[in-house]
Regions:
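Bacterial Sec-dependent N-terminal signal peptides
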Residues: 2-6, 11-34, 405-407
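Extracellular beta-rich repeat passengers
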Residues: 30-63, 74-89, 94, 99-192, ...
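Active/ligand-binding-proximal structured segments within catalytic/core domains
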Residues: 71-72, 449-452
Length: 565
């Protein structure tokens, strides 16, 4: 055999061995996932697997999860979870078009135990720390420890409750080192935290915590990693803090002291009472280029160690935009950091910011810190916020807050709105009748939202009644569009605003559409804001004498803002 033929034969033999090795390592989708993995194993691309208990990847073994794999936790009496132990690895590389999905057959918060990684990086919880789930050791002396790769993964419906004190998160990092690659992860619809770090040095990018009913992001026990492009979005009234940050509850000054460096965050609360960013228990932090909205207490500080670090510059909060104020809950002594410190000129911070975000999370504020000057891990993104318009890194692999793909869900609009409601861009809204915003309620319509009237036998229209408000602030780049499936004049009934300003038609005046009262004695009545809105194909004919306009203003007062329509 000549040399060329020998090489070809050797290559073919090696390929055959390689295929045999892979086939040996691939787990059959018919086999339930439970117990210990002690050798390298593969979950094959595009396959669906069933998790029926705790799955531990043991030291020396690697679990490879290929793109498009779905793992479904069984709704049974077992505690289902996946745990990567110290010295083991996970190689889970999904893609934007084929994410890895870990979910449950019971589509409810708290259905299963989530994904847990245990590493050998430093923590401040002692030498015998054990994971809250699986009783696995974590922590050590190797900040560069490598637990593998996590990319384009969605964990849904985590947060299994073990006791009143212990619930499993979506993603949990126990002493994970910065040799581990972590980006493009979403924790969706869980009953505990979306993401939690127990010490470690792991760096993270492109994280989304969506409607997790405890904290969106949580750290403790000395986490000292970096994070960039992180989104929290809360809908449920049960949701707690957007960020809950601790060093160590038992010893606030335990070392290493938690000191993550974070940039480009968009944190959107549920509009209820509660905290946005909660810094406490001695934690330090550097947070830059961040938007916080939807919480009555956007930033709170607690404990002397935490406030001292802010006051002396060890911790830094810069280029941060808060919808509400800064408050101290420090019960250990005098307040060491307050809103005046937060608003100092060199911090470039703002309180009272009104968010102009598309789909609740998309949008940025120009101007910010180039965090790449702090560490090469960071991209140069000198703006506040995580998701710039025109660069939707969530597209295709993540879910929206209502469970639709980021390509857009469909929601029907009809009847009465009696409480504040927000229409989000990216969601397909179909108007299938009269939509009345009732007294005391505000309808907020975000930039870029499209409302489409259905082509049917029902009269479709949108009406803001007396005492109600509309807050519809489109932009030149992202106007609000109200249109019809049937692209013809007279297809639907248009937009109608009823106010309490003077009219000369008497005290019993009613709108031509919707039979709503209008007129009064308040020339300064305020029905809200209308900016950059396009109404298309209005003018529905009720009779020979009555047709609906595009925009109709019934006794609207001059407290209302109207432009660019």
């Amino acid at each position: 055999m000549n040399k060329k033929l020998f090489i070809l034969a050797l290559g073919a033999a090696m390929t055959a061995v390689s295929c045999q090795e892979r086939n040996k390592n691939v787990i059959d989708p018919e086999v339930d996932l439970i117990g210990d993995i002690t050798e390298d194993r593969i979950l094959e691309e595009g396959q669906t697997y069933t998790l029926t208990g705790g799955l531990h990847v043991k030291e020396g073994a690697t679990l490879t999860i290929e793109p498009g794999v779905t793992i479904i936790a069984q709704d049974d009496n077992q505690v289902d979870y996946i745990l990567i132990e110290q010295g083991a690895k996970i190689d889970a590389r999904g893609t934007a078009s084929a994410p890895i999905v870990m979910t449950s057959n019971r589509k409810e918060a708290g259905a299963w135990g989530g994904l847990h990684i245990c590493g050998k990086a430093p923590i401040n919880a002692g030498t015998d720390a054990k994971s809250e789930i699986g009783d696995a050791s974590y922590g050590g002396n190797d900040p560069a420890d490598n637990s593998g790769v996590l990319q384009y993964i969605r964990v849904e419906y985590g947060g299994f409750t073990f006791s009143e004190e212990k619930e499993a998160n979506g993603f949990t990092f126990y002493g994970v080192g910065n040799g581990t690659t972590v980006d493009h992860l979403q924790a969706y619809g869980g009953s505990d935290d979306g993401f939690e770090w127990f010490g470690g040095t792991v760096n993270v990018k492109y994280l989304i915590s969506t409607n997790n009913t405890d904290d969106s992001f949580d750290w403790t026990e000395g986490w000292c990693g970096n994070g960039q492009f992180m989104i929290a979005q809360q809908i449920s009234e049960e949701c707690d803090a957007l960020i809950e940050a601790d060093n160590n509850d038992n010893d606030n000054m335990a070392e290493p002291i938690s000191h993550p460096v974070l940039s480009n965050l968009t944190l959107v609360g549920n509009g209820a009472d509660g905290r946005g960013i909660r810094l406490r228990a001695g934690t330090q932090a550097e947070i830059y280029n961040t938007i916080v909205t939807g919480k009555s207490r956007a930033l709170t500080t607690e404990t002397e160690g935490t406030e001292s670090a802010l006051a002396n510059g060890t911790s830094k909060l810069q280029y941060i935009y808060l919808s509400s104020g800064v408050s101290s809950d420090n019960e250990e002594g005098s307040v060491l950091y307050d809103q005046n410190d937060f608003l100092a000129n060199d911090n470039h911070n703002e309180v009272g910011y009104t968010a102009q975000l598309t789909n609740s999370i998309m949008g940025t504020i120009d101007g910010g810190l180039d965090a790449s000057g702090i560490d090469s891990f960071f991209d140069n993104a000198a703006y506040a916020g995580a998701l710039p318009s025109g660069n939707d890194w969530t597209s295709g692999w993540a879910l929206t807050a209502d469970g639709g793909s980021t390509g857009g869900a469909t929601v029907e609009l009809e009847g009465d709105i009696t409480e504040d409601m927000t229409l989000q861009a990216g969601v397909n809204y179909t108007l299938i009748g009269g939509l009345h915003v009732k007294e005391g309620a505000t309808l907020t319509i975000e930039p870029g939202t499209v409302i489409t009237a259905q082509d049917d036998d029902i009269v479709d229209y949108l009406l803001i009644e007396q005492g109600a408000k509309i807050d519809a602030r489109g932009t030149a780049d992202n106007p609000i569009v109200m249109t019809s499936e049937r692209k013809e004049a007279g297809s639907w009934g248009g937009l109608h605003i009823c106010g309490k300003a003077p009219i000369n038609a008497g005290s019993g005046a009613k709108s031509e559409i919707g039979d709503a009262s209008y007129g009064g004695n308040d020339p300064h009545d305020n029905s809200g804001t209308l900016q950059y809105i396009r109404v298309e194909y209005g003018g529905y004919a009720f009779s020979e004498e009555k047709e609906a306009n595009g925009f109709t203003f019934y006794g609207v007062g001059n407290g209302t803002t109207v432009d660019h329509l």
